[in-house]
Amino acid sequence: MSSTQEDQPNPDFEIDHPEAYSQYFLTAPREISFYLNLLVKRGSLLTAHIDDGKAFFLTTMIAVDDEKQAIFLDSAQADELNTAAKNAHRITLTAKLDRVKIQLRLPPLRHQLVDGQKMLVAAFPQAILRIQRREFFRLESSSAHPILCRIAMEAPEGTLKTFEWNVADISGGGLSLNAPTSLINDCQRDALFKNSRLDIPGEGVLLVNLRVRKTSEFSAENGQHYLRVGCEFVELPGSRLAMIERYIARIERERKARDSGLAN
């Protein structure tokens, strides 16, 4: 599938505004490789925008060569678009991956035959933009299969004390914890919980750093009072973020299936 937008204004890509979206750029080679390979594994549909974006075509990422730092894309159906992509100054790829907007900028593409299949080949991008603000979507933890978080705090005498709290909700940007009110002094804003163990059903245990952003008190259905401790992830590697996003997407699919009567 291909198209042009002759009568439409040029698309405005977030990747062209690093000053506004700096926190969403991934530049570490390992993270770039991880997401490129994830696009291949998922068979994600990408839109390849040529130069200013008025001409574009749909494609998929067929393979990634980490050693040669090259990506292989399915060619466009129209030969003129393949030629335009080869002669372009830049190519902007856009996609959605588990509710997250992905953008990356490629140099001009070249044609290459791989096992008799015509492909478009480009070098690895220098950065990947992944946009998911925390407020976009939060998943409430299931009471049947709760997410647990083990927190380690340093006591005044220098020893470590550990607590295991239920996660109330989780997103790609952070989570909320249910904690006893007796620990309110340990859960003040900007408190940092390093190497917390996040046990996500079906995914495994992740080590995460959490910074407290907000603490409030609430009453549970049983009448007891608890703290709701809102935290953000700090320096979360892309591979661990992908596990969290995969869990969120899976639970949402299961809930939608139950709501539509497709699952018991």
UniProtKB/Swiss-Prot annotation:
GO terms for cellular component: bacterial-type flagellum basal body. It comes from Dechloromonas aromatica (strain RCB). It is found in: Bacterial flagellum basal body. GO terms for biological process: bacterial-type flagellum-dependent cell motility; regulation of bacterial-type flagellum-dependent cell motility by regulation of motor speed. Monomer. Interacts with the flagellar basal bodies. Acts as a flagellar brake, regulating swimming and swarming in a bis-(3'-5') cyclic diguanylic acid (c-di-GMP)-dependent manner. Binds 1 c-di-GMP dimer per subunit. Increasing levels of c-di-GMP lead to decreased motility. Belongs to the YcgR family. It comes from the Bacteria. This is Flagellar brake protein YcgR 1. InterPro entries: PilZ_domain, Split_barrel_FMN-bd, T3SS_YcgR, T3SS_YcgR_PilZN. Pfam families: PilZ, PilZN. The gene is ycgR1. GO terms for molecular function: cyclic-di-GMP binding. Residues 132-249 form the PilZ domain. Keywords: Bacterial flagellum, c-di-GMP, Nucleotide-binding. The keyword Nucleotide-binding applies. The lineage of its organism: Bacteria, Pseudomonadati, Pseudomonadota, Betaproteobacteria, Rhodocyclales. The keyword Cell membrane does not apply.
